[in-house]
Amino acid sequence: MFLTCMETVTKELVSWMRGHESSVFSISVHASGKYAITTSSDTAQLWDLDTFQRKRRLNIRQSVGIQKVFFLPLSNTILSCFKDNSIFAWECDTLFCKYQLPAPPESSSILYKVFAVTRDGRILAAGGKSNHLHLWCLEARQLFRIIQMPTKVRAIRHLEFLPDSFDAGSNQVLGVLSQDGIMRFINIQTCKLLFEIGSLDEGISSSAISPHGRYIASIMEDGSLNIYSVQALTQEVNKPPPPLVKVIEDLPKNKLSSSDLKRKVTSGRVQQPAKSRESKIQTRILKQDLTGDFESKKNELPDGLNKERLQILLKGYGEYPTKYSTLIDKGTHVAFLNLQKKYPIKSRKLLRVLQRTLSALAHWSVIFSDTPYLPLLAFPFVKLFQNNQLICFEVIATLIINWCQHWFEYFPNPPINILSMIENVLAFHDTELLQHFIDHDITSQLYAWPLLETVFSEVLTREEWLKLFDNIFSNHPSFLLMTVVAYNMCSRVPLLNCNLKDDFEFFFHHRNNLDINVVIRQVYHLMETTPTDIHPDSMLNVFVALTKGQHPVFNQYPKFIVDYQTQERERIGNDELDYLRERQTVEDMQAKVDQQRVEDEAWYQKQELLRKAEETRREMLLQEEEKMIQQRQRLAAVKRELKVKEMHLQDAARRRFLKLQQDQQEMELRRLDDEIGRKVYMRDREIAATARELEMRQLELESQKRLYEKNLTENQEAVAKEMRADADAYRQKVDLEEHMFHKLIEAGETQSQKTQKVIKENLAKAEQACLNTDWQIQSLHKQKCDDLQRNKCYQEVAKLLRENRRKEIEIINAMVEEEAKKWKEAEGKEFCLRSAKKASALSDASRKWFLKQEINAAVEHAENPCHKEEPRFQNEQEDSSCLPRTSQLNDSSEMDPSTQISLNRRAVEWDTTGQYLIKKVRNLRQRLAAQARHRCQTAHLLAA
């Protein structure tokens, strides 16, 4: 589909616009003339008239459908009305939805078909297949009035406001074109009928009002065009007529009930304006209500009604009384529920009327529910009488009873007897044509039956078909059969040229270039010239009208076949219902299975996700643990490096101090050597004493050196380091119980280092231990409670190390028993003080013993001084172990082999260093003694 744009002055084609797939039934142009909206049944499109290009397109669901889309006058708003009674307002530029009108009250809800808007765009009038008019206030966006037209108005076909130059666009007069062809103009405020145009005899098909409201152009049902002068129609309307509508109550602003909106119709008479004798315009003012006239004359009617009176009744009421529609009220027959699939008719209204008519025929007689060609037979009559289904039904019923006699005797086969009549007549009048049919195996079922079952609707135009049936209905029923023969005889030339069966089929199913008047004349000729023995009128009954009140019974068909088919159809229908029920059950079961499968799949997926999440979390935890272990390893490595560096620094400081002392000693020795050289001659006898004195002084210097070194660098530092190590071990044991084993090893290393230091530095540590005994006692006393609580954990750790301590278990048990005995004998600080005094005494004795051993046996016992010190250290250790310290025993006893090995290695290193120093001192002494002896011998020789 495409739209053409024409220039009104030059009448030339400007452009055409493509885009619609179905016919366009509405065009609305914007007040500026820049935009236009075209509407079809499935879409509405917005066009730019400057470029003739499509800007936007409104698509909707097929189940809804568009009723109308148009611009509001003097506004930039687009109003869209759909078939579900929804009305939306859109902004033209942005196409933003401004608002939606609410649904009308259910009690007065109608399907809107036609719309009209005042020139100021404030009031929207809507109507449809009802005698109600809805007036919407677009500013308040609510329904403010319902106008009820007279009862003779059954449907509203067109609405249009009458413009007025003095109402500022708020039009008050609304033109309403109803189904009876009369256009009534009413005042929407006073609800009075002003005037009307058209009549029942000369109905209006469509109408339009000039922009200034001076003229009304109407196309009549007979095709004529009438132009009315509004001024002439309203010259006596100033005398107000009695209202047709009684105002019950205007709508309050806060209510929307249909009872408050509705204005009810009352009977009345409108004064008719005087007609001008010169005027030939056929207009009528509203006469008294036809309802009252017909009701008053109802009992005065004779036994029958003529055609003119029936037409008056039909135009006045729009339908016949209800008692004649009993067949229609039975609903759609089951045989025609899917009629649209076999006969896809574009017009839904026509399809609906055809379906209802066929259903009425099927309800009338069972045979028609199984007649396959019934839709083809009834379709032309349905299309002709689509606005009155009762007439359509009765015409078809009359046709079947009279012109379709004996058609159903051979059901479900074609009427062979009727076709034989046609063939006999054709054989009599045109033997050559019949012989041509016989030669090409063309039977009457091909050249006669297609024309009968479609009643010539496929081969004739509308006008030709109407002309033909005017003659058929006006003659004997045999006239229809003669028409078939006449049609073949008039078409003998093209038929004689056909040689293929497909050509014959095409010919009898399509229109041909044939004059229907010639055919009709030929039919009349055949009716007159056909012999009586083969004439169909001798075998067909004369015309019989339908009975009054109820329709006649139609049973001219093989009842057993129809009953059998009906039973089979019912059986098949029941089987289909059973099958559908079973299929529905299976589908329900399948749906449940699918749902269960989906739920199971979802559950499995959820479990899989949970498992993956758990694995991810576990991997993350493992990674974190690995990182923590690596960090701990790095921290331990850093600690080891720091300790090694500390030891190296201590060793370097000690070496520097020793070197300084050695240098000082060498300087002193050189000074002594010089002094001895000067006095050698004077003190020969004092050489031995001087040598001893020098040795003693050397020992004193060595002891002073060690004391100074220990006092300055290690005494306080060792004690502070010991206390810090103990405090750190205590805090680490409390905060990180899971790392007790590593901390225990560190505590063991610290204790081992302290033990080694005590072994190597007995003298200095003894003095400092006397000063810090109380401090250690207090710290150990605080740790006692926690040590008791963690004793259980230590025992569990001890189980893992018992295999490494099998050789020490007897010593540990003895120490534990000794500790238990001493714990019971004394408590608290007294035992600690006694232990401290004992340790001090042992330290003094050890110091005296050490000095004595160094002086008397420096050379003989220098190689294994540690063997002499070990018993003393063990005694001191036993004394110190008597303190109330359970953790000390456990720490010293629960060291692993690696810790013991590291302690032994350090002890060996300390022993090696001590031996080296002692060896160096011994060599120095030997050298000094040798020098002294050499000088002494030289002096004796000189003296001699």
Swiss-Prot record:
The segments labelled Disordered in the record are 262-281, 865-900
Coiled-coil residue windows: 605-735, 791-825
**Keyword Cytoplasm on entry:** yes
What keywords tag this UniProt record?
Cell projection, Cilium biogenesis/degradation, Coiled coil, Cytoplasm, Cytoskeleton, Repeat, WD repeat
Q: Where is the composition biased (Basic and acidic residues)?
A: 865-875
> Which parts of the sequence are annotated with region: Mediates direct interaction with PJA2?
931-934
Please list the residue ranges covered by the WD repeats: 12-52, 53-95, 96-143, 144-191, 192-229
User: What biological-process GO terms show up in the record?
Assistant: cilium assembly
What transmembrane ranges does the database entry give? none
Q: Where on the tree of life does the source sit, at the highest rank?
A: Eukaryota
Q: Which residue positions does the secretion signal occupy?
A: none
GO molecular function, one example?
A: molecular adaptor activity
One Gene Ontology cellular component term attached to this UniProt record is: cytoplasm
Which Pfam family would be a valid example here? RabGAP-TBC
What job does the chain carry out?
A: Molecular adapter which is involved in cilium biogenesis. Part of a functional complex including OFD1 a centriolar protein involved in cilium assembly. Could regulate the cAMP-dependent phosphorylation of OFD1, and its subsequent ubiquitination by PJA2 which ultimately leads to its proteasomal degradation.
Please give the subunit comment from the record. Interacts with PJA2; the interaction is direct and recruits PJA2 to centrosomes. Interacts with OFD1; regulates its activity in cilium assembly. Interacts with PRKACA.
Designated name of the protein:
TBC1 domain family member 31
> Origin organism of this chain?
Pongo abelii
Gene from which the chain derives:
TBC1D31
